[in-house]
Amino acid sequence: KAAGLPIAFDFSDRWTPEYLQATLPWVDIALLSCSHLPAGQREQALDQARRLGAKIAVATAGQEGSWVKWEGRLFHAPAAQAAQVADTMGAGDAYFAAFLCSLLQTAGEEGLFARDLSQRIPRAMEQAAAYAAKTCALEGAFGGGVPLAGRTELTPLEKDLSL
């Protein structure tokens, strides 16, 4: 952060209020997995993340979609429907990666937060949801990664990271 680079952090679903309080002053973009929370508590969690220092707070809740809190505004995007679901492992990670890629690709030379985000955030959420849905069509890699040695071409999903 001292170098002027934005810090993004995925808190997963194992965050506590105490952990957020200790961590969020150092975080610019926070992702909270909130599938385990009722709808009202999700917005409270986003508000808490913003109060504690995150410029952008993101909450994901699987099939219920995602929410982003920025500058007092709450954005919602529905989940994209996967053509087929093989495994949801990694969908949240894929969402956050695509969300960040979209914001970075539209940032311009002035930096990530210099331009108005009111139109960039909904676009990033839509792209992130679509990418997460595509990820659900793949088997998860926990404990069973795919060897990369000798590969010369990207998979269609890897090519799609260009958004």
Regions found by a protein language model. Name each.
Residues 1-48, 65:
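Conserved beta-alpha-beta core of the PfkB/ribokinase-like small-molecule kinase fold
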Residues 43-163:
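Conserved phosphate-binding/catalytic region of the ribokinase-like
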